């Protein structure tokens, strides 16, 4: 069964908008776990626009599920990860001017530096995932540098029109198959919603979906615990089969 990692960055976004103490991402993470979250995902950005170092440390101490730290491949973040020892890190591209992560890592063009990070993390028993687009070039490069995991970027699928969504779904489905053939374990995320998650959750060998914005948006209406329960049920028992021909 596909697991659910709940990204709580948007809780911190609300807090930082007023530079206040609430809402507290740590408290919300615990509610997410009560709702059935299999893991908590956070992105500690270099500019600290939402998640803060304090959040990271408290989450490591308090949550009962897995902590997945999304981070840029920088010296500062590597040192933080080695000190904190999260259950997993996910290396993502990062630009200060972006609102959210806009695309996957170019592993093929940065193989040497990324391999050094992956090797270092794995030697310290920190599993490392690479956030990549679902294409053979990046998947093959990820395998070559020794990564155990990849997280497939589902943004193009999520943004696609109704007409084009089956095509984008096929790319994700084929990406999962290619990754597994290369010996990689596969997660996915970015832009998934209550309306589009079920086909992705139906893909065989998809291990975890990392989802944040749509759950937090839903939580405003019905509460975080119930929002997570609803998403968990969709992933656990998807009613829709994969698109025809995929």
Curated annotation (Swiss-Prot):
It catalyses: 3-amino-2-oxopropyl phosphate + 1-deoxy-D-xylulose 5-phosphate = pyridoxine 5'-phosphate + phosphate + 2 H2O + H(+). Pathway: Cofactor biosynthesis; pyridoxine 5'-phosphate biosynthesis; pyridoxine 5'-phosphate from D-erythrose 4-phosphate: step 5/5. Homooctamer; tetramer of dimers. Keywords: Cytoplasm, Pyridoxine biosynthesis, Transferase. This is Pyridoxine 5'-phosphate synthase. GO terms for molecular function: pyridoxine 5'-phosphate synthase activity. Its main location: cytoplasm. One of its GO terms (biological process) is pyridoxine biosynthetic process. Gene3D superfamilies: Aldolase class I (3.20.20.70). 1-deoxy-D-xylulose 5-phosphate binds at residues 9-10, 45, 50, 100. Catalyzes the complicated ring closure reaction between the two acyclic compounds 1-deoxy-D-xylulose-5-phosphate (DXP) and 3-amino-2-oxopropyl phosphate (1-amino-acetone-3-phosphate or AAP) to form pyridoxine 5'-phosphate (PNP) and inorganic phosphate. 3-amino-2-oxopropyl phosphate binds at residues 7, 18, 191, 212-213. It comes from Prochlorococcus marinus (strain SARG / CCMP1375 / SS120). InterPro entries: Aldolase_TIM, PyrdxlP_synth_PdxJ, Pyridoxine-5'_phos_synth. The record marks 151 as: Transition state stabilizer. The keyword Phosphoprotein does not apply. It comes from the Bacteria. One of its GO terms (cellular component) is cytosol. NCBIfam families: pdxJ, PRK05265.1-3, PRK05265.1-5. It is an enzyme of class 2 (transferase). The keyword Iron-sulfur does not apply. Disulfide bonds: none annotated. It is found in: Cytoplasm. Belongs to the PNP synthase family.
